[in-house]
Amino acid sequence: MITSIVFDVDDTIYDQQAPYRIAMEKCFPDFDMSHMNQAYIRFRHYSDVGFPRVMAGEWTTEYFRFWRCKETLLEFGYREIDEETGNHFQEVYEHELENITMLDEMRMTLDFLKEKNVPMGIITNGPTEHQLKKVKKLGLYDYVDPKRVIVSQATGFQKPEKEIFNLAAEQFDMNPSTTLYVGDSYDNDVMGAFNGGWHSMWFNHRGRSLKPGTKPVFDLEIDSFEQLFGAVKVLFDLPNLSLIHI
């Protein structure tokens, strides 16, 4: 039986592609917007690849943000941009992030869990101040105790490292074997949960494909916000219906 649940933030609690798309349209109007979904996925890829260098002290956060923007654009045949242009994109992107809201289906899911008194938590990769600002903006403190929110930069670890999941299990007072982690990234969220001995739900609403030869290690896969509420409701309303084998 699953007794507790922990969520990723970016592109799980809210639609992160929306602010990215608006920033791209404003800053690079000649970019082929038909590639937007794939460009966003690659932007997230470069975020995952580059941020460890910030954690290691090799790059500044500012350079990392410029680099992920530049590399994404180059991959889609766009001209190489300079740091000033990249910094402007980041400013516009951050401004658009001020407008993020929790989607109705996610709010319905969290309301249900709160009503059921299910312990909840948050594990998110990224710069501490930046991520906590999102947590507050999204109203997550209405559902999650601040002591059950972990941002990677503040710990020295990051998803998919098992250490951040071990730390969360201890800090949140949750049993990994009965805790479900929900996130959109297979590499960070699903593999991270697996590494930490947690269960996982892959929230694959961007339609990502696994690399050839990859053995799936998630317990459940859903592909829309609409499916999220139904899956969570079944887990906690009908615990004897074994969607997840403990």
Give residue ranges: language-model regions:
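Residue-level marker of alpha-helix boundaries and capping positions
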Residues: 60, 100, 122, 180-181
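Generic recognition of short, well-ordered alpha-helical segments
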Residues: 18-22, 104-108, 133, 162-163
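Internal, well-ordered alpha-helical segments in soluble enzyme and binding-protein domains
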Residues: 65-68, 109, 164
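N-terminal helical cap/lid subdomain that shapes the substrate entry/recognition surface
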Residues: 2-9, 13-104
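Asp-based, Mg2+/Mn2+-dependent phosphohydrolase catalytic module
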Residues: 1-5, 111, 123, 127-243
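Catalytic-core regions built around general acid/base machinery
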Residues: 105-118
